[in-house]
Amino acid sequence: MDNRGSFFFLLIVFYLLLSSQSRPPLLDQDRERQREVARERDALRLLNESKYGDFDPPGDKWLPFAGTRKNDSYAWGILPEAQGRARHQLRSAISNAGLEPPRSLEDPDALPSLNLTQLLLPVYRNATGKLRGDWVRRKLNKEYPKLNTTAIALEHGYFTHEFGLNITGSSGTFYLDLREGGGEELRVDSGQVREIRATLAVESNDFWGNTWYISLFGVHFPETGAIILSSNSEKFEGLFVLPHLAFSSDAYELSHQLLLNSLSDTLSEKENRPPTLFPWSSLIGSEQVEFPAPKCEHIIYLQQHPVTIHDYLADKPVVDQIEEELRFPIGAPVPPAPLMVMSAVVFSPDCGYILETKGTPDFPPSEGLYLTGPKIEEYDKYSARLVFIICGVFAAQITLLLRQIKEASTPSTRSRISFYTIALMAFGDAFVLIFILLELYPAVSFLVMATAAFLTFLSVSYIGMKFMMEIWAVQAPERREQERRSNPPASTPRSTGLPLPATSAPVRDSGATPIILTPDQDPPAEEDDQPTNRGTTSAAQETRNDVGAMYARFYFVLFVMLIISIWSFLWPNRLGALYARALAFVYLSFWTPQIGRNIIRNCRKALRWDFVIGQSILRLFPFVYFLTVRGNVLFIHPDTTTAFALAGWVWIQVWVLASQDILGPRFFVPRGWAPAAYDYHPILRDGDESEADLESGGVLPIGALRAEDLSGDAKDEDKQRTKDRKRAVFDCAICMQEIEVPVLAARGSAGGSSVTEGATSILSRRTYMVTPCRHIFHSTCLESWMRLRLQCPICRESIPPV
């Protein structure tokens, strides 16, 4: 085999991996980069020269930064109203905790003289965590002029006037992810401030629903729990404006000094970095965005509420001890960490709207007030516990699957199992793992995730796939037979001119020696040995090719479904929710293919009952958790209706399987709707062999059985019974014990109705089985025998699977 192409391909890949990834910038790029650095140096100088009160849009005071100039036509007239709502939320948070708020909070004119950084509250000093809460759109008191989008598009070279991140709808849900650490921090006698970054997902509650993702950077005052966040882009230099958005002069001074230090370090780092088209990198280590598009800018005021333990205000030293134990656990006797609670006001200066969280007294407590969520340490702990539970679920599923594989160790038992039932289970395992990895990978250690991934690989790609391949190979002849029946070969005319005489037969051997057939009517071995071997070899090769095609199709369908499912995150919320519920319904229908195969094959006991019940409970667990627990780690909206519907659907399927096991696989299927299949549990009735119709199933004359009746009709214990009903006793050739079977009266005899007789004998029929060759055995004996071979124990004739 020629491998020169592969060698050259690997050589090129090796060269690309070892080659330097950094290239000197082009001359035009270097000049643009120098101009960009000069502009940013000038902006930093202007920030250093500014002072508190320089930015006052109602007083016609503006800043020289992009987005805060007078001719930018932003709706800065809404800023006082947004700040008023933020002050109101601060007062409510202090009052609800049982503390007395400063009186100067009521008077906006007295705010500049207020020392907000000295307002010490019992709050978490590290605000890193994940929070969720409902929001409403605030109705503005007056109309403001619309943004001059044409001028902005011309200034920045945008190819469209459509703004992204324009939040619509009157209500929805906030999903806030706060991250501290790795940024600048400033500690002085007057207070403390540090950098913070956040990601805000805004979900609307309109009909289709939409979700917007906003990246934010800002400052956090740990002593008071106040946070100011802003977006940043080439048309809005939000980081330079942040200090001027503070409520008091002391907060301005702290944030002003912090940002001067941080932005100076960032600019120094940027001078040594390859060029980028993004005009400003917000924080050190933040991601850069090349080719920005126009979008709505946002400013967010967050206020953390004082921590309460069992509805009592916590002391500040206790809160510090809780935080210390969370970050460096040593087993200290501290109370469990309460959830973080925050109020939020979201203000868009260019798109002109205000969003705020629900709070008292405007909304009752039953509405789900404020933003609530665990600190990141608690969230990581909950996530790790969930992954551990998922690992336990996978381990239990693997155990049940191994038991079922051991039970279905013969071709007879494997032919009863539906391939699509096992395939749906494997699909579900793969989906559960991949989406948990996508959502919880940053919160859970690599070792825990590797354990879950290994168990899933074991369940899907090793044990499950091996079982599916065995089932697929065993059922290959059945599929080929169905294809032959659906596509019969076209008849070809004889090549000879005249047909043979009716009394003649084609001569196969012209020798004088006659052909003597064996008693079992088998053809001569020398004539058919070679074709049989050739046919067996071709059938085995065809089966191997069929299994390989199934393997490729399985992973192709899995890959396509994963791509579509990941793409569904970008769909409108309602459409994505409908897709997720439809996918869950299809996945939890894994018993439906088995029910259908039981009907087609007319078989009852295909799966172990511990496998059926165990898999049903284990595979329902993730759906019940995420759809019923409000504080689940993925912040999925509770939907008990869907949870109960999915659980009820699985319950119905299990009951149908149980009914098929007791009443028969086709008890609810009208006669003629399913293909004909042999019934191993016919009703025995008085009559001679001429009335036998074995293929029809249902009723079999007692005289058609090839067994010795040991009892007759004159047994003493049967004399008390009705004349139209008796029992017969036969020998089971497997266990050598007697079989006692009920025998109904012959047709036309006087007695009870056939409906009554059939109802009373439906359970007793399950104790015996009659083969197509008319031999009778105990059900348990013959089923055990048929697990090993599909031959009659007496006459060795082939018999169909149960």
UniProtKB/Swiss-Prot annotation:
Pfam families: DUF2921, zf-RING_2. Gene3D superfamilies: Zinc/RING finger domain, C3HC4 (zinc finger). This is DSC E3 ubiquitin ligase complex subunit A. Component of the DSC E3 ubiquitin ligase complex composed of dscA, dscB, dscC and dscD. Residues 403-429, 475-550, 596-608, 664-802 are cytoplasmic. Its EC number is 2.3.2.27. PROSITE patterns: ZF_RING_2 (PS50089). A zinc finger (RING-type) spans 732-796. Keywords: Endoplasmic reticulum, Glycoprotein, Membrane, Metal-binding, Signal, Transferase, Transmembrane, Transmembrane helix, Ubl conjugation pathway, Zinc, Zinc-finger. Disruption phenotype: Impairs growth on solid media under hypoxia and leads to triazole susceptibility. Impairs virulence in a murine model of invasive pulmonary aspergillosis (IPA). It comes from the Eukaryota. One of its GO terms (cellular component) is endoplasmic reticulum membrane. Residues 532-541 have a biased composition (Polar residues). Pathway: Protein modification; protein ubiquitination. Its main location: endoplasmic reticulum. Residues 478-541 are annotated as: Disordered. It catalyses: S-ubiquitinyl-[E2 ubiquitin-conjugating enzyme]-L-cysteine + [acceptor protein]-L-lysine = [E2 ubiquitin-conjugating enzyme]-L-cysteine + N(6)-ubiquitinyl-[acceptor protein]-L-lysine.
